[in-house]
Amino acid sequence: MSETNKRHRAGFVNIIGNPNVGKSTLMNTLVGEKLSIVTAKAQTTRHRIMGIVNGDDYQIVYSDTPGILKPNYRLQQSMMNFVDTAIGDADIILYVTDTVEKGDKNDEYIAKLQKIDCPVILVINKIDISSQQQVLELMNWWKEQLPKAIIFPASAQEKFNLDNIFDAIVDNLPVAPAWYDKDVFTDKNLRFFASEIVREKIFLNYKDEVPYSCEVEIEEFKEGTERYDISAVIYVMRDTQKGIIIGKAGQALKKVGTQARIEMEDFFQKKVFLRLFVKVDPDWRESKKELRRFGYEY
């Protein structure tokens, strides 16, 4: 092994925690790219998404995961499978909580972290909306739950204390060669990001159960010299939801399409021609066949 390889560190840093604590915002900020969609609604993230940060002597493979929940249907069970896999193959666990919650509702996962062999870095996010006393109380509570964890108060939104978190990650990476080529920044392809961008706009523009009843599939993705031609199907579970997604005279769907196209053009750095369609599939959240088609695992 060369001297360079002896010094090189690389590993998988898997981000887990409850819904809506800022896991996706944290990963996007650490990676420097918007790879995970972000909304104010819980359970926005459904897949495990990797973001890779490279330096001369390190490679960090971040992995954003769905928020921990008790599954009510097969889609959510698949989401929790992503979380369990992430715990099992981590070199470092980045457990994210915030100043709004206490983690005692996650007894099962806290017990797993107490027994795990790899380093655990615990991030108490959103300290910008809390008092110093509240943050200190939470830090002490978490020290009792996870005595071996490295604990950081932070604000992913305000980028507070992220440099120290980054340094702790690099210091705790195993000595290893890079897992991916140094010019790779994610494991997902452009079709995946196109579908996620559309899904984000659905979460931002509709309320109640509608966003949770939708899935987006890219049926066509053609790269031309000047633009991408993309056709996406939004699957819903009921005819009434289809009507809500389309809206009066198609205006709601048009708004989603415009917002998605603008973000795709910024992300892909190329013009986009986007077509959206809406179809009804009552069983997609429970059908193993459909879930596999949409990229979920069993």
Feature-to-residue mapping (PLM):
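Conserved G1/Walker A P-loop phosphate-binding module
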Residues: 1-81, 85-87
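Conserved glycine(s) of the Walker
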Residues: 22, 161, 252
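Conserved, well-folded catalytic cores of nucleic-acid-processing
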Residues: 33, 52-56, 86, 90-93, ...
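Catalytic P-loop NTPase motifs of RecA-like helicase/translocase cores
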Residues: 45, 68-70, 102-103, 130-131, ...
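Conserved C-terminal guanine-recognition region of P-loop GTPase G domains, centered on the G4
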Residues: 57, 81-149, 222-224
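Active-site glycine-centered loops adjacent to acidic/histidine catalytic or metal-binding residues
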Residues: 64, 125, 155
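Canonical P-loop GTPase G-domain recognition
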Residues: 119, 128-186
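P-loop NTP-binding site
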Residues: 190-298
